Swiss-Prot record:
Is synthesized initially as an inactive proenzyme. Formation of the active enzyme involves a self-maturation process in which the active site pyruvoyl group is generated from an internal serine residue via an autocatalytic post-translational modification. Two non-identical subunits are generated from the proenzyme in this reaction, and the pyruvate is formed at the N-terminus of the alpha chain, which is derived from the carboxyl end of the proenzyme. The lineage of its organism: Bacteria, Pseudomonadati, Pseudomonadota, Gammaproteobacteria, Enterobacterales. It is a peripheral membrane protein. HAMAP family: PS_decarb_PSD_B_type1 (MF_00662). This is Phosphatidylserine decarboxylase proenzyme.
Amino acid sequence: MLNSFKLSLQYILPKLWLTRLAGWGASKRAGWLTKLVIDLFVKYYKVDMTEAQKPDTASYRTFNDFFVRPLRDDVRPLNTDPNILVMPADGVISQLGRIEEDKILQAKGHNYSLEALLAGNYLMADKFRNGTFVTTYLSPRDYHRVHMPCNGILREMIYVPGDLFSVNYLTAQNVPNLFARNERVICLFDTEFGPMAQILVGATIVGSIETVWAGTITPPREGIIKRWTWPEGEHEGSVALLKGQEMGRFKLGSTVINLFAPGKVNLIASLASLSVTKIGQPLATSTETFVAPEVEPAPLPAEEIKAEHDASPLVDNKKDDT
């Protein structure tokens, strides 16, 4: 009965209005009130503040500052084996496995369309048919920055407007086509393991979705699909990210979906639905063997990533193929 009531609220409540209100409140500096809200949040969700660079909740000026808090460098060691792709986010695996032609598993008894997830882009969908997917759910207590599973060259980004359903276990089990209905940002990369898509899915109360190369993608929510492209390789204007480097963030929790081309990676055998994920830990192995360079570049430190994020031009300065 309680679950039925919660599901009914998902359809009845003004999710966009609530999300805008939450985003507005989370960005305000309110002194002692901000600290009180953060303290209550930490206690209720059992957030481990010992992992944060700033464990003192009084050091955060806004709730958003707290929510995208950086972690200490030593708490998420990166697996540097060049044949291993690593987990992109802290959270729990919702589902993972093979993409069956155009079908991706959402929950037991529920599939959704690969092409619908990619906003009808059949050319992009063709890259991943019969490939591999991993869906990672970030709960409110988790670290909410998203990192790269491997080195990648950004080729395309698509903003897809949509609903703002919650993306927790209950809704994943009961709301059809959940991830293909919700607002999302699709990022396509060229990698040593073939094309890879990393998709940031919005949800109720998710105030914004950001990337390190473009800043805030949403809001504003204009209600139209927008597309940007970048050059390949080392051409001027290209965006290259390293394995383990931050690529985006959520302000309040949501979901990350990774898509891999067929025959390119094998998921770690011990992973299953509800497996806990930690950034930098093994997610998949290559079907080919790569040899590490003599000196492998390390991910940028948090301070340099922040400076790069702040200095990056807005997406409006990129090639917009809307």
